[in-house]
Amino acid sequence: MNLLFRLAVFLSLWCCSDAQGQTKEESTEEVKIEVLHRPENCSKTSRKGDLLNAHYDGYLAKDGSKFYCSRTQDEGHPKWFVLGVGHVIKGLDIAMMDMCPGEKRKVIIPPSFAYGKEGYAEGKIPPNATLMFEIELYAVTKGPRSIETFKQIDTDNDRQLSKAEIELYLQKDFEKDANPRDKSYQKAVLEDIFKKNDHNGDGFISPKEYNVHQHDEL
């Protein structure tokens, strides 16, 4: 799993914002958490700023209809995101605090910590909808996005990351990973990194681009 977390250095750089529709008056509502399974051995639990790797399914609490399944996207790979900074809706940020790798939870999220009065996804999530998520957390690691990581990748110290430098960094992580991927997968990851972060298209990722945030709702 280590590789997946390292990749999020690049793939998780989008903007941080609270869920739509949240107000101070509504903030008294609570996210309800039911622990379905928690491993006996848990040496590390999730906290704000950690990089998580997880699958989750989303349902409308009203009728149980499913509106989201992470297993049906990205060839079934678990999602990568930094906890507590708005990469996911606020209710999930709250619900996934203090989780162990291998833990499963069922959570109920009120509208104020989800999509509020606006709803989302062309009617799939109606206004003022309470949501239910089933979450499975695979692993937790310290969030890697930092100037130190940038410098580690920037081997020639020219203050920009080339494809060759990032490819080398990824290759080292592939060698450490318990489930190594083939070259085609590594190439696809590299292309995705530049697609999402090389905003001026010059073939390099600058310090500014490295820290540019984009938005991803779920």
UniProtKB/Swiss-Prot annotation:
- Please tell me which stretches of this chain the record labels as motif Prevents secretion from ER: 215-218
Which GO molecular function terms does the record list?
Answer: calcium ion binding; peptidyl-prolyl cis-trans isomerase activity
Catalytic activity as recorded in UniProt: [protein]-peptidylproline (omega=180) = [protein]-peptidylproline (omega=0)
Output the InterPro entries linked to this UniProt entry: EF-hand-dom_pair, EF_Hand_1_Ca_BS, EF_hand_dom, PPIase_dom_sf, PPIase_FKBP, PPIase_FKBP_dom
Residues binding Ca(2+) 2, per UniProt: 198, 200, 202, 209
Enzyme Commission number(s) from the entry: 5.2.1.8
Residue limits of the PPIase FKBP-type domain?
49-141
Q: What subcellular locations does the record give?
A: Endoplasmic reticulum lumen
Could you name the domain of life of the organism this protein comes from?
Eukaryota
**Cleaved signal peptide residues:** 1-19
Post-translational modification note? Glycosylated.
Main localization is: endoplasmic reticulum
User: Per the UniProt annotation, where are the glycans attached?
Assistant: 41, 128
Keywords (A to Z) from UniProt: Calcium, Endoplasmic reticulum, Glycoprotein, Isomerase, Metal-binding, Repeat, Rotamase, Signal
What this protein is called in its record is Peptidyl-prolyl cis-trans isomerase FKBP7
Q: State the encoding gene.
A: Fkbp7
